[in-house]
């Protein structure tokens, strides 16, 4: 598949995977030696490049959920513009790698928040694509960059390490929205979303 050649020319697979893991761990966790660091028990990540619709997805392998698989579309890779190939491949890999190493409140975390955290990590790895925009229409947990930029606002407002604390909170208990956000930053998420919307209005 021509997408395979594009991938192999753009990145060295082993280094690309290693770099994306480092980005995820440095943004979502304290240093490995810290007693407060509890990284998930992911034992392996297998990258599978294949022809398929869409962009990419991550799943547990048939062995068990500690072995992850990232499926990345060769058709999508082939269609990336020349100037964006490396950054887009690294951006997608980093986003998917978050799903291998993030917590989800025992399966109760909203999907939009899960995807927002992944794009927040991508954003903070300097891999955001040029078409991403901050927007405050709709719901805060619509996911992806929509939620990713909102999380970036929260990180700046409440201090570096806030999203790391959010991920840790998703490790230890189930997600009950009002309680979760009030315990994390002292106010409900709807209020934060309103504040964020006001900030974006002022930036226009």
Annotate each predicted stretch with a short phrase:
Residues 3-14, 76-84, 88, 104-108, ...:
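Second-shell loop/turn segments in exported
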Residues 12, 16-19, 23, 88, ...:
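Extracytoplasmic/secreted proteins, especially bacterial periplasmic and envelope-associated proteins
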Residues 105-153:
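Post-HExxH zinc-binding segment in Zn-dependent metallohydrolases
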């Amino acid at each position: 598949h021509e997408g395979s050649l594009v991938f192999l020319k753009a990145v060295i697979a082993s280094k690309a995977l290693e770099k994306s893991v480092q980005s995820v761990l440095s943004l979502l966790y304290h240093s490995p030696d810290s007693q407060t660091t509890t990284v998930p028990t992911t034992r392996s990540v297998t990258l599978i490049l294949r022809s398929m619709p869409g962009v990419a997805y991550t799943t547990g392998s048939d062995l068990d959920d500690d072995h992850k698989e990232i499926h990345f579309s060769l058709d999508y890779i082939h269609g990336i513009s020349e100037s964006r190939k490396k950054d887009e491949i690294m951006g997608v890999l980093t986003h998917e790698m978050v799903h291998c190493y993030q917590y989800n409140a025992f399966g109760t975390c909203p999907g939009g928040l899960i995807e927002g955290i992944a794009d927040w990590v991508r954003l903070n790895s300097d891999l955001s694509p040029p078409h991403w925009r901050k927007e405050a229409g709709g719901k805060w947990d619509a996911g992806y960059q929509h939620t990713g930029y909102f999380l970036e606002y929260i990180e700046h407002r409440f201090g570096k390490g806030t999203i790391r604390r959010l991920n840790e909170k998703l490790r230890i208990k189930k997600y009950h929205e009002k309680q979760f956000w009030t315990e994390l930053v002292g106010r409900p998420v709807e209020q934060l979303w309103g504040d964020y919307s006001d900030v974006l209005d002022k930036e226009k």
